[in-house]
A protein has these predicted regions:
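N-terminal entrance/gating region of PLP-dependent enzymes' catalytic architecture
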Residues: 1-116
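Conserved PLP-enzyme active-site core in the AAT-like
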Residues: 7-12, 124-298
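Short acidic (Asp/Glu) and glycine-rich catalytic loops that position anionic groups and cofactors
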Residues: 21-27, 54-57, 79-80, 175-178, ...
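Glycine- and acidic
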Residues: 28-29, 81-89, 113-120, 152-155, ...
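Catalytic cores of large soluble enzymes that bind and process phosphate-bearing ligands
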Residues: 35, 39, 65, 69, ...
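Structured alpha-helical segments in the cores of large, soluble enzyme domains
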Residues: 98-105, 164-169, 192-200, 318-325
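Short glycine/serine- and small hydrophobic-enriched flexible loop segments
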Residues: 107, 134-138, 331-335
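Active-site C-terminal subdomain of aminotransferase-like
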Residues: 255-258, 264-354
């Protein structure tokens, strides 16, 4: 094999201490692309040094996100970063793992199989909430037109307590929906079910029940809300429905309060979202949404995509993304099972700090 002066130079570069290298001595532009490449180890160190002053996620007691996964899970996820979650024809087994996760959650939330439930992964609960809201809006619009309601007379509205997460405000702004907020106060640290119907009219696309309010940690009384909605539906042509924002609670309540009725056991709960990167115990970001039946997910919101190699239905706001979080979620379901999640959740019920 022939060698040249360039080989000598390349070899010498590895002998130079990292912080004595030429690349470490030059000023790297912050907001435009630099002219020449640098060695991988130096790029790694420079980026790592940039992050030194940030907080340590493991020490952040205020985070809502999972900050630790087992080495086996981390390894599995790092080995699958390149898989595109939407390319189901190229990665059929990855698609099957997503399908398994959807069915596991549907079973956990008592989805009635006779109504042909469906669901999908998302990049987090915010996207899942957007999808749940869109489904309610499109369904309301179709039903309103069938009733002869003038849908141009006023904007549709969504009813929710003032303990809402900002994604619902985004939903209402992005998709031209009025947000009708039921105030919380000292006597009502969750949705005031005695007043909720005061905010409802025939332009209401649905009511959001929150399972785990950010400010208080409380669950809205979904069973009481369901009874109120059922009574309303008996006396009105306009059908009210409930979406459960279970970003925190939907992966917590089944293990800690299994007798609490908040999910698809209640007839008027039509969709539920949760965050896999909270009590699903997966690194950010992954979320999930399940609809109880076909009629609650309007067909016009489902797109058949064929240009990735095979026709496939997709319901999402985002498109290409790594499948590693989905794979991490299935790993956790497989690894922990019901009893494992129950033990983990029971360890978080009442934390004490002294």
């Amino acid at each position: 094999m022939l060698y040249s002066e360039s080989d000598k130079t390349r070899k010498e570069s590895y002998r130079v201490p990292l912080f004595a290298s030429e690349e470490e001595q030059i000023r790297i532009p912050n907001y435009k692309l630099k002219d020449e490449p640098i060695e991988a180890k130096i790029a790694y160190q420079l980026v790592k040094d940039e992050l030194m002053d940030e907080g340590n996620a493991r020490q952040n007691l205020a985070t809502f996100c999972q900050t630790y996964m087992e080495p086996e899970a981390t390894k599995l996820m790092s080995e699958t970063l390149e898989k595109n979650a939407v390319d189901k024809s190229e990665y059929p087994q990855t698609a099957e793992l997503e399908n398994k996760c959807v069915n596991i959650l549907a079973d956990l939330w008592h989805a009635p199989s006779a109504e042909k439930y469906s669901g999908t992964s998302t990049v987090g609960s915010s996207e899942a909430c957007m999808l749940g809201g869109l489904a309610m809006k499109f369904r309301w619009r179709k039903k309103a037109e069938e009733r002869g309601l003038d849908i141009a007379k006023q904007r549709p509205n969504l009813v929710i307590s003032s303990g809402y997460q900002v994604c619902w405000e985004k939903f209402c702004v992005y998709w031209d929906v009025d947000m009708r907020v039921v105030p919380m106060d000292e006597a009502h640290l969750r949705l005031d079910t005695d007043k909720v119907l005061d905010y409802v009219d025939e332009y209401t696309i649905g009511i959001v029940g929150i399972l785990g309010i950010t400010y208080t940690g409380e669950f809205d009384d979904i069973q009481a809300l369901d009874k109120i909605v059922a009574g309303y539906n008996k006396t009105h042509d306009h059908e009210l429905v409930i979406h459960i924002d279970g970003a925190s609670g939907a992966m917590f309540a089944p293990f800690v309060e299994p007798d609490l009725k908040w999910d698809f056991q209640l007839d008027n709960v039509v969709s539920i979202n949760t965050s896999g990167h909270k009590y699903g115990l997966v690194y950010p970001g992954v979320g999930w949404i399940i609809w109880r039946g076909e009629e609650y997910l309007p067909r016009e919101l489902v797109f058949d995509v064929s240009y990735l190699g095979g026709s496939m239905p997709t319901m999402a706001i985002n498109f290409s993304r790594s499948a590693s979080q989905i794979i991490g979620q299935y790993y956790n379901f497989l690894r922990y099972g019901f009893s494992g999640y129950k033990k983990s959740m029971n360890g978080h019920v009442i934390p004490h700090f002294t």
